[in-house]
């Protein structure tokens, strides 16, 4: 039973009430009684609107299901389908051209193209590491990953391997030649870097000296001009340092004493309360709110044990240099932080309203993450987040412009409660639901004074694609989905629409996650496609990945690329509406079994950690033991995919259950090294995680928009109650 406190007519879980009273309110000018009264007013006015929007979702989905029931199959009438979507209010008329007018936005969002980290806010260590990932060692990122192949004697080994180190140095010198070209010659083989009369002087391998091709790239240095310890440069809006220490282990092996190249990496980071966390009750929510408060105050710390030693990890201070004109130059030492609130779907028992009903969780997140954010806006906060007085909130899983307008209304009401100027709360719009995609222009317009990013989330978007057209027929195999017409159109349409609405120079246009955190060589080859596509940010799973992905923004001038793209529209709504139905279902039994096993294993591997450990995002080995970054979005695809094939008789219930039971020992083996892990097999009837995985598939067609949260939350609460 949850202990509760009466506040403002609300029944507030004591753990949340105490957090607000003892931690979040102190240091602000807010009065406790006024805050709770304001929160109660917001809940009373907006919870019914939230509920009504969810009813519209269900009503529309019901009509779509019925239409497909009468027009099933791959040869459906495209024109009739589009007309039907307009008739039911799914596809709206496109608004007249407009430009967003968001103001007070930090340059990390408006004019800097670079990587964006996403991390679960419930994990303080991850959160601090992500905040500090604004700057990253290129040498470490190359040496410690498969970005440099372990061939020709270049194995990582257990101690420093000079062969590998030399390959790292060579890679870095090639980067310098590209991002920091000299007036003549190459960075390869250089023997010295000094600052002389506000210019860079580089000694080449032959003893001659040269400067920079573009002297304006030099911004400053640390140390002394004739013996700098770090030299700061800028290229394509991103900063980087050449770090020099001839006495260091690496510097000793380098002709110029260079020990590292430090790259500006995770320019922005999303601290996530949504798909990457498992927060099902007041205790979980308060853990996240407390970590977010620490990030906003700049005092979040974590005790870390490594190599038998314990130390305190804290947030980095800003970086200072002597600029070329002799004045002090300061750069932000931390990633600019967004917070991702949950969507409109779920309710939380952290607060019960005056009638004893659970409150929409998204309303709670808006109130309490913004309350915590007040602390980052105080003038005496030396580790403040925004320098323009804004709070940045990502809002996921919205369906169409009415839901975006509701978010804007909610943010306005929260500003009133907290005494903030109008439009302090900025919104990042996740374009990850089909009804938002096809009405994206109207969605942006609904938040035209608040929008600071639009982002394609192809994982959730695929889940919604499958669920929306569940009754239309069997979809293509999961691996073939990326080759379908709709997904390329969706990605291009997002950029086209954002540029036409004036997001360039005012907001981010983002792309999705690289989900294979151990495959950095592949990421270096492939993820350059995101900046080439006109995205001025894209998601990465780790600080190391952020450093390596930053290289792509040195290779591609994103803002120049956006100007090229803006000349012509590349995608149409008609292409987006192409349903990814399989043209033929003559798959072999082996192909069907392989598809079933892959998805069953993926579901079990993720769900067992969610239910048993409360871990919402982790590296989960796939059926081939390749580690994939899984969260609720990947779970949504896998569960909806099997539900679709089951619905249309491609596989049977018996086959699905057999696959789950056969894959359970595979997942158990993959987790065998974890002493806290409880095996899924063989007690399938009593194992709550196994039951949750089964529910997600067998109840998949009836879950709201194919979301996984209702089942996960219910089963996680059940697990916590049994193991209390």
Curated annotation (Swiss-Prot):
Binding-site residues, acetyl-CoA: 118, 125-126, 276, 313, 541
Binding site for Mg(2+): 432, 460
EC numbers: 2.3.3.9
Domain of life, source organism: Bacteria
Cofactor(s) demanded: Mg(2+)
Family annotation (SUPFAM superfamilies): Malate synthase G (SSF51645)
GO molecular function, one term: magnesium ion binding
InterPro entries in the cross-refs: Malate_synth_C_sf, Malate_synth_sf, Malate_synthase_TIM, Malate_synthG, MS_C, MS_N, MS_N_TIM-barrel_dom, MSG_insertion
Keywords, comma-separated and alphabetical: Cytoplasm, Glyoxylate bypass, Magnesium, Metal-binding, Oxidation, Transferase, Tricarboxylic acid cycle
Residues with PTM Cysteine sulfenic acid (-SOH): 617
Pathway: Carbohydrate metabolism; glyoxylate cycle; (S)-malate from isocitrate: step 2/2
Enzyme class label: transferase
Biological process, per Gene Ontology: glyoxylate catabolic process; glyoxylate cycle; tricarboxylic acid cycle
Keyword Metal-binding: yes
Active site: 340, 631
Residue numbers binding glyoxylate: 340, 432, 457-460
NCBIfam families: malate_syn_G, PRK02999.1
Subunit structure: Monomer.
UniProt similarity note: Belongs to the malate synthase family. GlcB subfamily.
Protein function: Involved in the glycolate utilization. Catalyzes the condensation and subsequent hydrolysis of acetyl-coenzyme A (acetyl-CoA) and glyoxylate to form malate and CoA.
Protein name: Malate synthase G
């Amino acid at each position: 039973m949850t202990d509760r406190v009466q506040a403002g007519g609300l029944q507030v879980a004591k753990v949340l009430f105490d957090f607000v009273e003892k931690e979040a309110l102190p240091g602000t000018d807010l009065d406790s009684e006024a805050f709770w009264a304001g929160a109660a007013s917001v809940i009373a006015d907006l919870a019914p609107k939230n509920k009504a929007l969810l009813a519209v979702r269900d009503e529309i989905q019901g009509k779509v299901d019925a239409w497909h029931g009468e027009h099933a199959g791959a040869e459906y009438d495209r024109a009739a389908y589009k007309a039907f979507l307009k008739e039911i209010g799914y596809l709206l008329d496109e608004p007249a051209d407009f430009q967003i007018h968001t103001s007070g936005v930090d340059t990390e969002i408006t004019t800097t193209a670079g990587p964006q980290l996403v991390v679960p806010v419930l994990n303080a260590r991850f959160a601090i590491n992500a905040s500090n990932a604004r700057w990253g060692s290129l040498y470490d990122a190359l040496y410690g990953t498969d970005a440099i192949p372990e061939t020709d004697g270049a194995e990582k080994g257990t101690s420093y391997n000079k062969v590998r180190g030399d390959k790292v140095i060579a890679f870095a010198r090639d980067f310098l030649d590209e991002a920091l070209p000299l007036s003549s010659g190459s960075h390869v083989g250089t023997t010295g870097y000094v600052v002389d009369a506000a210019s860079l002087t580089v000694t080449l391998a032959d003893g001659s000296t040269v400067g920079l091709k573009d002297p304006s790239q030099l911004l400053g240095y640390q140390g002394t001009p004739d013996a700098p310890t770090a030299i700061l440069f800028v290229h394509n809006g991103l900063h980087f340092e050449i770090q020099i220490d001839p006495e260091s282990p690496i510097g000793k092996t380098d002709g110029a004493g260079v020990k590292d190249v430090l790259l500006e990496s995770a320019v922005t980071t999303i601290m996530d309360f949504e798909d990457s966390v498992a927060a099902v009750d007041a205790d979980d929510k308060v853990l996240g709110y407390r970590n977010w408060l620490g990030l906003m105050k700049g005092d979040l710390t974590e005790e870390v044990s490594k190599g038998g030693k314990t130390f305190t990890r804290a947030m980095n201070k800003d970086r200072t240099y002597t600029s070329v004109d002799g004045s002090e130059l300061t750069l932000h030492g931390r990633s600019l932080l967004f917070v991702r609130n949950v969507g409109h779907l779920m309710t939380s028992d952290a607060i019960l309203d005056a009638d004893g009903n659970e409150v929409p969780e998204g309303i709670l997140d808006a109130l309490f993450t913004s309350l915590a954010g007040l602390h980052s806006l105080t003038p005496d906060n030396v580790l403040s987040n925004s320098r323009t007085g804004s709070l940045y909130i990502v809002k996921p899983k919205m369906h169409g412009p009415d839901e975006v307008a509701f978010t804007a209304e909610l943010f306005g009401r929260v500003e009133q409660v907290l005494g903030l100027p109008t439009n302090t709360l900025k919104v990042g719009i996740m374009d990850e639901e089909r009804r938002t995609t096809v009405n994206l222009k109207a969605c942006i317009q609904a938040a035209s004074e608040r929008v600071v990013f639009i982002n394609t989330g192809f994982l959730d978007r695929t889940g919604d694609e499958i669920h929306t057209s569940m009754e239309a027929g069997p979809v293509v195999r999961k691996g073939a989905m990326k080759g379908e017409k709709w997904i390329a159109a969706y990605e291009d349409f997002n950029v086209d629409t954002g540029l036409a609405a004036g997001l360039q120079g005012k907001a981010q246009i983002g792309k999705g996650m690289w989900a294979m955190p151990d495959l950095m060589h592949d990421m270096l080859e492939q993820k350059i496609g995101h900046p080439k596509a006109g995205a001025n940010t894209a998601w990465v799973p780790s600080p190391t990945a952020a450093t390596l992905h930053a290289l792509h923004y040195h290779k591609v001038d994103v803002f120049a690329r956006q100007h090229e793209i803006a000349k012509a529209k590349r995608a149409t709504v008609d292409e987006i509406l192409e349903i990814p139905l399989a043209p033929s279902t003559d798959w072999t039994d082996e192909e069907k079994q392989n598809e079933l096993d892959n998805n069953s294993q993926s579901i079990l591997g993720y769900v067992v950690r969610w239910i048993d450990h409360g871990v919402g995002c982790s590296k989960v080995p796939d059926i081939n033991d390749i580690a994939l970054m899984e969260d609720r979005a990947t779970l949504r695809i896998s569960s909806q995919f099997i539900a679709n094939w089951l619905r249309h008789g491609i596989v049977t219930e018996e086959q699905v259950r057999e696959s789950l039971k056969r894959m359970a020992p595979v997942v158990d083996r993959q987790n065998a090294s974890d002493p806290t892990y409880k095996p899924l097999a063989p007690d399938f009837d009593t194992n709550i995680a196994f039951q949750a995985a089964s529910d997600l598939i067998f109840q998949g067609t009836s879950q709201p928009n194919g979301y996984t949260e209702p089942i996960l939350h219910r089963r996680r609460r059940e697990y916590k109650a049994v193991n209390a």
